[in-house]
Each structure stands twice: as structure tokens, then as C-alpha cells.
Amino acid sequence: EWTGFKSKEFPLFSAKCRVTDDSLMTCAVAEAFAKAQQEGRLGEDAYVEGLLAHFMRTIGLRYPDAGYGSKFLYWLQHKELGPYGSFGNGAAMRVAPAAYFGRTLEEVEHLAMVSARVSHNHPSAYKAAKAVAGCAFLARKGADKDGLGAYAGRYYNLHFTVEGIRDSYRGDSSCDNSVPQGIVSFLDADSFEDGLRNAVSLGGDSDTLAAIAGAIGEPFFGIPPLLVVEARKYYLPELKKWENA
């Protein structure tokens, strides 16, 4: 992340591997949605937003060095704070659970927006969250890449390839300069792992690009069992809970 690394050739696992802020916040969103669903209150936005803030702070402060942006970390540390207008890609990196708790595309898009606005209440963040969650949902329902590209193309210009932008791309943590690249990392891939490698090879905010590519790639390609076995070695308790959900 942020090293300017520009290659698909790297060991997928190493002794330096650790869970990222992306994964932890995805678990927090899943916890909030699951609790609301169990209580029959998933349709009550204000209640769900309260749960989201609670679980994000509870899990986030358990691992304060996971790699959060400075503004989001400050938000985590001050429970009295509401959303702060962020257009950062944190709204997209954590949104995957919406694709599993929404029953229709419209519900998924709404849950995506709810998950974003607890901290990232900006139109760019809403757009990003809906695009990623919607793609993941449609992939779960059997959409092909043409269909997924057409759907995501409602939100972003995707007329580029990973190979075509790799050398010139200079990423940042804004939604508009990272979410399209994460989606195209999936669209240009021929496997789940290839999507991750595409994302990392672009440099920039590589863990978030990979979180986006992986959120769509898992329901589309599936994850090879051997890769799961290796990844499990790095799981924290928060991730283990959702392994077979």
C-alpha cells in the first residue's frame, strides 16, 4: 500500500501479512446488519446507523493500528461525533455485507448508502458504496461480466484496462480515483486471485482496491480452497465468525 508497487508478481502470503482496516470494518458492517436483521429492524435506518457506529468503534478501537485514515480514526475515537462528509473510499471498502443482507438490488443499494453515511455522508461515497455492493449482489445472482460492467458503468467511466493504466495511475483514497480501478481489477481478471493481483499491481491504496475487487470476485469466481486455508492463518476472531456465513 502506497509504495508505488506496479507488478502482479509477488507472494500472495508472507510473514508480514496482517488483517487490514478494510476487513475489520467489513466485519463491523456485517455485525450491525446481522443484529438488526435478527431483531427485525433492518429497515429502520436510524437504528441500523446506530449499530453501525457502535460496531465500527468497538471493533476498530480493538485494533487501532490496522491502517485507518486519520480522520476516520479520530471519528472512531470520539463516539459523540456524527458523519463528517468524507468522500473517501472507506465507504466502498466495507460495503460487501449489503450484498448479502439485501433481498433485491434496490434494498442492497439502500443498505449500501446506510452503511456509508454513518461516517461518509457525501454523494461520491454513496455512489461508490452502491456500485460495489450492487456488483457483488448481481454477481451472486449470476450476472456475467458484461452485465456487471454495464451496471457499474452507470456510476463510473470504466473504459480503461488495468494494463492500460498501470504505469500512469497515481492512486489516492478518494472514491472517484480508486473505486473504478478496483472494479476494473475484477473485470479484467480471470480468477479471484487474479483480481487481487490486478488491484495490488496498480499501486496506490492497494488494500482497498483489492477489497473492492475481492468483494465482487468472491461471488463471481469463488475462492480456491487452498487459498482459504492459507488465509485462515491470519484470521482474527472477528473474521473467523463470518468464515462460513
Q: Which positions does each model-derived feature cover?
A:
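Structured, active/binding-site neighborhoods that engage oxygen-rich ligands
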Residues: E1-A245
